[in-house]
């Protein structure tokens, strides 16, 4: 299994093409699949943060592929990539290998793997968390979770994160990159504010569906953030 996560930024008159990509890419993949087994086209929060205000200049495209070869063929030949290269001002792609995943996304676990691998002591780890928020719990979610997400950057071992969503307000996700698993776990399980919110999501049943996945970063291309450019 091979996963690509692309972030593309559009500016000026081309901002409209970022917005239109949400519909156009669905049509293009319907016409030719290129070996995609799971696809998510998502907007992002303001400046890429986990914010209720959208950032119309930045869009994220996540695809799960049958193999790396299928992605390479897509990269070279697809109209989707030609579109991104033509209209975006900058873009980067992270290449990921799922190692651990539990939960559901649209009724399935797209990152489920039978491989049993652990992360090395100093190996970069990429984490994706996503949830479908119950309508009557949305206010509770937006009062609590964004503040926690903003604490990412203040925590030791943090490298990068982006808040994204496939449906405004109700279907949200965060992708974050950490120096290693130890730093990630320290934030997720030992930081008091984060633990309290996690307990609320469960006891108050904020989500109708959720998923948590960990990936190995196996490569990247494009204008990657400086914090992860040397990985």
Model-derived regions: residue spans:
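Short S/T/G/P-rich N-terminal loop/turn motif that feeds into the first structured element of a domain
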Residues: 1-59, 68-74, 86-173, 183-190, ...
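A common structural junction motif
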Residues: 79-85, 195-196
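Extended hydrophobic/aromatic segments used for targeting, binding, or gating
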Residues: 186-187, 191-209
